[in-house]
Structure formats: structure tokens, C-alpha cells
Amino acid sequence: MTIQTFTPDKVLVSEKKDGTLHKEFTDIIMKEVAENSLVMQLGKYHEMDGKQEKTVYVQTDGVSAYWVNETEKIKTDKPEIVPVQLRAKKLGIILVASREVLNYTWEKFFEEMKPQIVEAFYTKIDEAGLLGHETPFANSVAKAAKDASKVVGGPVTYENILKLEDKLLDSDVEINAFVSRVSNRSALREARDGDKKTIYDKESNKLDGIIVVDMKSKNFKKGDILAGNFDNLIYGVPYNINYKISEEGQISTIQNADGTPINLFEQEMIAIRATMDIAVMITKTDAFAKLTDASNV
């Protein structure tokens, strides 16, 4: 009996329109997603051994409350190591392309679509884990800040940045990163102390000596800044990337220039839906704070 193997440089996309993405492709995508995702850069990775759920262990500070699963939190009265249930959820993206790609080899198709797939995945992960936008997860950095009453309302100023830091320092949280956006940089440069010295170093992109990472998302508004100790953001990736290619139907989440949904058959296009399993969890309840416009508080 001849065993058939998948050879990306020979198999056409039209011959394999659904399944698990080839390991070689998955490894490349996950490497580039990890290099760009702020959740993956700032958070703590836990190996899930291919499981949907995994018990991991977290060191507590003996003062704060900690989430041990999606719905249960405990109050600790002494430093200890507690078991935490990390549970993966599905995140999906949809991309569209011309129908001619069905005649590409998988190797050529991957080369052309990889940048879009990578960007779509890391954007989806960060919007879910940091902002709580269209998230399957029970918590996010922004939600944790709101739930802990650690939201400062107002513009990006020296005084408000200090208030943002104080929200965390009052709980003995050591800030190790700010999440901002490039459009905030002019305001950050103008954040000056009483001696008119700026607390933002544009060369190193540090604010008050702490690293700033910039998020690209239309759902993260100008003037918004997240702060916290991101060691309390944990994640794991148990499975490969699965995909399915469709040639018919309408795509309501992606629209034409006139606002109408894309009709795949009529417009001779295809839709690629890719899903990955990822677990993202906030462990410490008071580890994050947010600065946002006063109208949002």
C-alpha cells in the first residue's frame, strides 16, 4: 500500500481545502505571531502539552486575591504556590482572497497569505487578552483594571500618569510595562514634572523608566494606556492551526467598499477561516490599571 504524504510544493490548494495546517507552516506562523503579539511578549508562557485544560502553578504574594479558574478566585494570607486551571479557547480569523489561489500550490499560497494570517492572529489575541474585545476569555487586562477600580479618567498628562502608577503602587504591584499606542507619543513627550523635565524617553520608549510597548488596534483608542505587572498574565497554546476554505456564501464580517457583505460566488473570491486554540488568563486580581478618557469611566 502506498502511503500518501502532503508535499506543499506539489499539492494544490483546491485539493486540500480543509484540515490542520501543515506543521512546517504552523511553526512559522506561531513563531511570527509570538514575535508580534503583546500578550505573548509580556505574558508568561505555560506549556499545555497538547491539552485543552492544564493545571499550572502560580506563586502568590500573600496579600492579593488570585483567579484559580475562569469563575473562582481565592484570597491568600501568606505567600504560597497555588494551582491554577488554564483553559484554551478557540480564536478564529477570516481572510478573503481571489479564487485563483485555488490553483496555487500550498507552498505559494502560504508565502502570499502568511503576513495576513500572522497579523490577523496576533491582533485577535491582543484585542481579546488585553482589551477584552470579542473575547472568549473570562477576563482581560482592561476588565481586570475596571473590576479592581483601577481606572483613571482623563488625558495623558504627568499628573494622570502618576495617578495611574499610584493605583498599582498602592497595592504593592511592581509595574513592568505600559501598553500604549504610537498616537500617544506626543502627549507622553509633554508629560513633564515640576522641573519641566519629561518622564518619557523617546529613544528607549520608556515612561518613568518603564518599558512602553505600542499596540496597533482600532479598538485601542488614542489616550488609552494600560499598566501593570504582566507576569500576572499567563497563556498557553495547546493545538495546531486548523483551516477551512469556502467558495460560496456571504462574509458579513468583511465588507465591500460600499458596506455590503462580500458574496464569494458572485465576486469570484474564497474565504479562508483559520482557528487556533489559545489560553489567556489573568491570575492576580489587582495587577493592572488603565488610563482612559474621562467619558469612558
Residue ranges, per PLM feature:
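Alpha-helical scaffold segments that mediate packing/assembly in large oligomeric complexes
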Residues: 92-171, 290-297
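Generic recognition of stable, solvent-exposed alpha-helical segments in well-folded globular domains
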Residues: 20, 24-28, 108, 112, ...
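Short helix/loop capping segments that flank catalytic or ligand/cofactor-binding pockets
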Residues: 64-67, 105, 187-190, 281-283
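Residues immediately flanking
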Residues: 59-60, 97-99, 182, 274-276
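Extended oligomerization regions of viral-like shell subunits
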Residues: 150-266, 270, 276
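Protruding loop/beta-arch "assembly-hinge" segments enriched in small, turn-prone residues
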Residues: 1-27, 36-38, 45, 261-297
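Assembly/oligomerization interface modules of large self-assembling protein complexes
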Residues: 14-93, 157, 162, 287
